């Protein structure tokens, strides 16, 4: 168990940076869920969702975030940030649209409004895949805040390694 005098590990520090974003995470998921971005049926909502995703990833430091043409009519976004010398490239993947549900019954709340029930958040696309998109944003913000503080000469990227990411 950790005592007050025990230094926080890198993973603990990173978790703290994530925990301090809880209001922002909820706000981001609320916004992401609010887009009725149904693949193939709601082009204007998909365009609005793509614009929000583009802005959000640009704000967390991803460069040249842009929409590419796709043969299926979806609006995939791509961005890139060069890794520091000697560091690996990491791919983050998620999507911001949802599949048509043929107006299936079962929702007792508006599916396009994030709703909290018994400590859980519900909203259309929150599990597939808008929640993951928001998790990527939170992780990128946390890494940008935390990594510069934890850099050491022997760990040029702040000691962040795949082991830490997997354990996290």
Listing of model-derived features with the role each one plays in the protein:
Residues 114, 132-140:
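DPxDG-like acidic metal-binding loop motif
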């Amino acid at each position: 168990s950790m005592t007050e005098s025990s230094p926080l590990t890198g993973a603990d520090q990173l978790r703290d940076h994530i925990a301090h974003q809880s209001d922002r995470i909820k706000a981001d998921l609320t916004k992401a869920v609010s887009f009725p971005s149904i693949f193939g049926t709601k082009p204007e909502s998909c365009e609005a969702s793509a614009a929000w995703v583009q802005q959000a990833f640009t704000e967390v430091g991803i460069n040249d975030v842009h929409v590419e043409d796709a043969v299926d009519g979806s609006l995939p976004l791509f961005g890139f940030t060069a890794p520091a010398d000697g560091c690996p490239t990491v791919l983050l993947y998620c999507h911001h649209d949802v599949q048509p549900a043929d107006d299936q019954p079962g929702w007792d709340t508006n599916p396009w409004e994030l709703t909290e029930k018994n400590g859980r958040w519900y909203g259309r696309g929150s599990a597939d895949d808008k929640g993951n998109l928001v998790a990527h944003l939170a992780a990128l913000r946390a890494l940008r805040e935390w990594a510069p503080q934890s850099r050491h000469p022997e760990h040029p990227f702040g000691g962040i390694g795949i082991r830490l990411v997997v354990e996290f």
